[in-house]
Amino acid sequence: MRAIKQIVHFGWEQALSCLFPAVIFASLAITQIIPLPFLPRYDWLLIICVLMQLWMVRSGLETRDELKVITLFHLIGLALELFKVHMGSWSYPEEGYSKIFGVPLYSGFMYASVASYLCQAWRRLKVELVKWPSFFAVVPLAAAIYLNFFTHHFSIDIRWWLSGLVIIVFWQTWVTYEVNGARYRMPLALSFILIGFFIWIAENIATFFGAWKYPNQIDTWSLVHLGKVSSWLLLVIVSFLIVASLKQVKEQSPTKAEMDESFS
């Protein structure tokens, strides 16, 4: 009975952490079924995302520090979108006033929503990292993974080499989390795989509702190739590494009270 209670509590905390992504998916579905007046669909999606972000901060569901991380992800995601659309990896075929070089600005919020989930789940589940690697190993690895999304169009795709490096670097790393007062743990690599798989499922839902289209989905929707899991897995790793590194820096930085005490 306790196991069921723990699973339900864990699911509830995860659902609360997924609030921003859930609103985006609901907006994609509603605007696909019910056309909204006055503005193109992409522009309404941008307005909804901005209002949702403001509400999340004003309501206290997200802190200002988390907003900084989420904004960073928005910019990182938007840069990736601009490049990938230019290279023909996917497209946004609908009209919109808020499109830049074929990319609607709301697309950055889809990446930001992943950061929102990570930040909130981290706080709600009181996540801690055990045997976290050196900053000097984590940052170059995250940078290499992100850059490979660009460079593989012009040279060798090294995603599988990078995946192997991730396993080596984080072989001894565990993530611990709290559910209803009890602490649990799992290998960090397993958490990467699980999050990447669920984002692939979310990607299928998003493309079904016309968030964007891959070349094989222009005429009719089809399941996103399972190989995309590897791409999302690596993107999740980049996201997690950035959030974790910023959390580590935040925890190691002295608070104002500590600084005042040290000078007293």
UniProtKB/Swiss-Prot annotation:
Alphabetically list the UniProt keywords: Cell membrane, Membrane, Transmembrane, Transmembrane helix
Recorded source organism is Bacillus subtilis (strain 168)
- This protein's major location comes to membrane
Its transmembrane ranges are: 19-39, 42-62, 69-89, 100-120, 136-156, 160-180, 192-212, 223-243
Can you say what this protein is called?
Uncharacterized protein YoaT
Membrane topology label: Multi-pass membrane protein
Cellular component GO terms, alphabetically?
plasma membrane
Name where it's found: Cell membrane
Q: What does UniProt give as the signal peptide span?
A: none
| InterPro entries reported for this sequence | DUF817
